[in-house]
A protein has these predicted regions:
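Conserved PLP-enzyme active-site core in the AAT-like
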Residues: 15, 106, 136-284, 348-351, ...
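Gly-rich Lys/Arg/Thr-decorated short loops/hinges at beta-loop-alpha junctions or inter-strand turns
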Residues: 90-101, 119-124, 149-150, 170-174, ...
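Compact, charge-rich alpha-helical regulatory domains located at protein termini
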Residues: 1-37
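Active-site C-terminal subdomain of aminotransferase-like
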Residues: 246-351, 356-358
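N-terminal entrance/gating region of PLP-dependent enzymes' catalytic architecture
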Residues: 35-112, 298
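Short loop-beta-helix segment that forms the pyridoxal 5′-phosphate
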Residues: 100-103, 119-139
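Flexible, glycine-rich loop/tail regions that form catalytic "lids" or insertion modules at the edges
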Residues: 38-41, 53-56, 76-77, 333, ...
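Noncatalytic alpha-helical scaffolds and linker/capping helices
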Residues: 401-402, 410
Length: 417
């Protein structure tokens, strides 16, 4: 029983002495007092019945009747009800990594099918079984390109999602990688490991890029591939994609997931889990994690990544979404999202609101006199009108969830503006 008891004072003192500290406080002195958690201001205990009443009372404060035209990386997409029913089964709802293939065939098969679907969507040879999100996918893609090219400089478009850029700065700073940000791809790219672009970019614009003399990384929202060419057809060597739009609720920002996909020759530099299909000793089909020498099973500093495994649950959500929607349903959702965006843009133009994009999918930038007043007017009518970019520009997005009536409400509200 001794092994399960908390440390006594003598043990704590011995541990502190062994690392050269005088007290527990010394362990946390680098953390400013202002950043430390104080005493929790909790209410008095309640019975289960009273607690249910209290939670319902709090829930009434939620605003659930807003219509959303907000995008910027997270979108209000249709989520089939069956997804949560399957994904929340105890067999799947776990952070466990399926190392014991003999007891995890279901999980491994889902991972394998997910990877297959991602390869079909991106046109690439191989895809991993998720990373955290699109931002980490971009950052990991840069690290991957640097390992492949053995060059320490990369080119990154300024028109990437700003949050992606922040994550990239963190990863590259920590790894001593030099990043140059561009508006237009330079003529000479041979001295760089890779060029990273987002298609469509953060502002919704679909831009064609010329061929480069280094590795090409294309970042995208996976739902855009319901209509656009695959990244492979665009000339990508590595694809970094966010997959929140494959059946994942917005969830106040997460959890979501991203993926990395690449050409087969770069497979051993691909971070994250990889599920493979083989046959067992009896000749039956079997699934297992494969090519694991890329991961933390080897020396940490030589591993391609130390990504955790629980994002595979979000990969399951994406697999279920694509299975339920089917190819036709997936394409229809994409077409409807794009149709709604272009319909809204056209109706706004008739009211004198200019769209700044030339080519876009479901997201575009509009020019207004006063962005704050513009968005506040919409919000007063229970419409979340978009993301303020600056005093005169607003980023607007639509999905298949926006009805024609909601688009008319958006435009009608501005007629009063």
């Amino acid at each position: 029983m001794k092994n399960f008891l908390v440390h006594d004072e003598n043990t704590r003192a011995e541990m502190l002495e062994s690392i050269g500290l005088k007290g527990i406080e010394d362990l946390f002195k680098q953390i400013p007092q202002t950043a430390r958690m104080g005493e929790l201001n909790l209410e008095k205990p309640l019975s289960e019945m009273d607690l249910q009443k209290r939670i319902k009372q709090i829930a009434k404060e939620n605003k659930t009747d807003y219509v959303s035209f907000i995008g910027g990386g997270i979108y209000n997409k249709f989520v089939p009800a069956a997804i949560s029913q399957v994904a929340n089964r105890f067999e799947f709802l776990t952070a466990y990594t399926p190392y014991q293939a003999e007891v995890a065939q279901g999980t491994l098969q889902i991972m394998y099918e997910f990877q297959t679907m991602m390869c079909r969507l991106t046109g690439m040879d191989i895809a991993n079984a998720t990373v955290y999100d699109g931002a980490t996918a971009c950052a990991e893609a840069i690290l991957m390109a640097v390992r492949i090219a053995k060059k320490n400089k990369v080119l990154v478009s300024k028109k990437l999602n700003p949050e992606y850029l922040q994550v990239i700065k963190t990863y590259t700073w920590a790894n001593g990688i030099e990043v140059e940000y561009f508006d237009e791809v330079p003529e000479n790219t041979a001295d760089y490991a890779a060029v990273l672009v987002q298609i469509p970019d953060y502002y919704g614009e679909i831009t064609e890029f010329k061929a480069v003399d280094c590795l090409s990384i294309i970042c995208c929202d996976i739902s855009t591939l319901s209509i656009l060419k695959t990244p492979a057809e665009m000339g990508a060597d590595i694809v970094a994609a966010d997959i929140q739009t494959l059946g994942m609720p917005m969830n106040f920002g997460g959890p979501h997931a991203g993926i990395l996909a690449c050409k087969e020759k770069y497979m051993r530099q691909l971070p994250g889990r990889l599920a493979g299909r083989t046959v067992d000793a009896d000749g039956n089909q079997a699934f297992t994690l494969t090519i694991q020498t890329r991961e933390q099973h080897i020396k940490r500093e030589k591993a391609t990544s130390n990504i955790c495994s629980n994002q595979a649950l979000m990969g399951l959500w994406a697999t279920l979404y694509l299975s339920l929607m089917g190819e036709d349903g997936f394409r229809q959702a994409g077409h409807l999202s794009a149709k709604n965006a272009h319909l809204l843009s056209e109706k706004l133009a008739k009211k004198g609101v200019k769209t700044l994009n030339k080519n876009f999918f479901n997201e575009f930038v509009i020019e207004v006199e006063d962005a704050d007043e513009f968005l506040n007017r919409l919000k007063a009518n229970n419409i979340l009108g978009g993301i303020k970019l600056d005093d005169h520009r607003v980023l607007v997005a639509t999905t298949e969830m926006n009805s024609a009536e909601e688009i008319d409400r958006y435009v009608a509200t501005l007629a009063e503006f």
